[in-house]
UniProtKB/Swiss-Prot annotation:
Record's subunit section: Part of the 50S ribosomal subunit. Forms a cluster with proteins L3 and L14.
Function text: Binds to the 23S rRNA.
SUPFAM superfamilies: Glucocorticoid receptor-like (DNA-binding domain)
Gene3D superfamilies: Ribosomal protein L24e (2.30.170.20)
A matching Pfam family: Ribosomal_L24e
One GO MF term: rRNA binding
Protein name: Large ribosomal subunit protein eL24
PROSITE patterns: RIBOSOMAL_L24E
Keyword match Metal-binding: yes
Classification via NCBIfam families: PRK14891.1-1
Length: 68
């Protein structure tokens, strides 16, 4: 059974054979599920500030727990 990839920007799982794989000069491998994620990553956008990313949703839950 093939292993699903996880987007390095938004955290979404996607099928093998789709998306893009980017290898940095230091050897770190980044997977992107869409061109939107790839462009946002290279523009330097913070995924914790975008509502549609998993990082935002996790940070939101942590903020809610601290308030209680």
């Amino acid at each position: 059974m093939p292993r699903w990839n996880v987007c390095s920007y938004c955290g979404r799982e996607f099928e093998p054979g789709t998306g893009k794989m980017f290898v940095r000069n230091d050897g770190r491998v980044l997977f992107f599920c869409s061109s939107k994620c790839e462009k946002y990553y290279f523009m330097g956008r913070n995924p914790r500030k975008l509502k549609w990313t998993k990082a935002f949703q996790e940070a939101r839950l942590q903020r809610a727990k601290r308030r209680k």
